[in-house]
Amino acid sequence: MDKKTSRLRRALRARKKIQELGVNRLVVHRTPRHIYAQVISPEAQVLAAASTVEKTVKELLKSTGNVDAAKAVGKIVAERAIEKGVAIVAFDRSGFKYHGRVAALADAAREAGLKF
């Protein structure tokens, strides 16, 4: 089993558990160059989103593929979710290790007011 398949299996296992809870989830996806975050309802509707691809976010950053960029995205997605009335979410790391950029995004979202 290769690295990508292992990650996807971990992601499916976690998503199944989150689905049983029936709560909104904060989904994170990372690539070497960018990081993306979405708050998704149990009915699969995107309630809030932010990424380093957005022009407004990109202007704030020196580089889009580092921990500082992840912190900025975490803060912005949390602010947008709270504006929509979402304060409690489940964290879906999409099978990525809770380390580095993924952990930085989660910490920034918590500091901005999301609870998980």
Swiss-Prot record:
GO MF annotation, one: structural constituent of ribosome
One GO cellular component term noted in the UniProt record for this chain: cytosolic large ribosomal subunit
GO biological process: translation
Matches recorded under InterPro entries: Ribosomal_uL18_bac-type, Ribosomal_uL18_bac/euk
Keywords, in A-Z order: Ribonucleoprotein, Ribosomal protein, RNA-binding, rRNA-binding
Gene3D superfamilies: 3.30.420.100
Domain of life the protein comes from: Bacteria
Record note on quaternary structure: Part of the 50S ribosomal subunit; part of the 5S rRNA/L5/L18/L25 subcomplex. Contacts the 5S and 23S rRNAs.
PANTHER family attached to this UniProt entry: 39S RIBOSOMAL PROTEIN L18, MITOCHONDRIAL, LARGE RIBOSOMAL SUBUNIT PROTEIN UL18M
Similarity-based family: Belongs to the universal ribosomal protein uL18 family.
Purpose of the protein: This is one of the proteins that bind and probably mediate the attachment of the 5S RNA into the large ribosomal subunit, where it forms part of the central protuberance.
Protein name (Swiss-Prot/TrEMBL): Large ribosomal subunit protein uL18
Organism of origin: Shewanella denitrificans (strain OS217 / ATCC BAA-1090 / DSM 15013)
